[in-house]
Amino acid sequence: MIAPADGVAFTTAADGDMRRNHQARQRLGLAEWATVRQVHGSAVVDASASGDHGEADGLATSATGLALAVFTADCLGVVMHGAGRVAVVHAGWRGVAAGVVANAVERVGDVASVHIGPHIRPCCFEVGPEVSARFVGHLSRTRTGTTSVDLASAVAAQLPVEPEIIDRCTRCGNDMFSHRRNGTGERLATVGWVPS
């Protein structure tokens, strides 16, 4: 587990598939989580209790100690804190292009800090013209020289504060789950909460 600040946790493959493994959740000390059924869209919903909160790609709350979680395997997991609120976002390229980050910023209000977890980095995030056209200011190259997108840069451009980015590529690192590398359904968790 990577815990860069109070109220923020990013799991690794060693922690297990957090989407399915409730015992692994308990090892984190946060057994009850508020979650959403992720759809690669822009919706961010408010949560006041644990459980499923429908189709969305982000959650926000002011409830102290309520763990909000999204699950990723190459997409960005983003945690925003500010003014007694927290938002957790599943930010894939479709969601970033659709405005999920801006919607989360709106839900938090006065954003004080942002953490971006392990995700597919430009070294491995090869994209075609339909994706690159949406991220013109954030293009890069893969290790093999093909066009890629720096999604963390695209997210950072939509934030009111400079994010702390965990600079670990899910596809390159065997200690992370990666849909592009493995094609499995295993997922990392991004968890955020308002500390007590």
What does each of the following model-derived ranges do?
Residues 1-196:
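Active-site microenvironment for binding and transforming phosphate-containing groups
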